[in-house]
A protein has these predicted regions:
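Short N-terminal "domain-start" leader segments
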Residues: 1-29, 83
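Mixed-charge, Lys/Arg-enriched low-complexity segments
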Residues: 33-83
């Protein structure tokens, strides 16, 4: 069950990622999902707090996009479960 969290979406140069930083029953976790490939590029990883989760998810996404020669765009974080 999700207690609180944030998410961001990246759509750039054919890439589509979703970044998450959430506090749930397992604690605070971060993850990054590749929507196009339908797979996790960074599965749930424990972090200290939501802010650290945002930083780690951003770093994972940046590294992933660099491999595709794409620059990380500015992120807009939204409250979890919002559209």
């Amino acid at each position: 069950m999700l207690d609180e969290g944030v998410w961001a979406e990246i759509k750039v140069a054919g890439e589509h990622l979703r970044l998450f930083s959430e506090h749930n029953a397992q604690g605070v976790q971060t993850s990054v999902y590749d929507v196009n490939a339908k797979k996790w590029i960074a599965p749930s990883e424990p972090v200290e707090d939501i802010e650290e989760g945002k930083e780690k998810a951003t770093e994972y996404a940046k590294i992933y996009l660099q491999r595709a020669n794409v620059e990380l765009p500015p992120l807009v974080w939204k409250k979890a479960r919002s559209v």
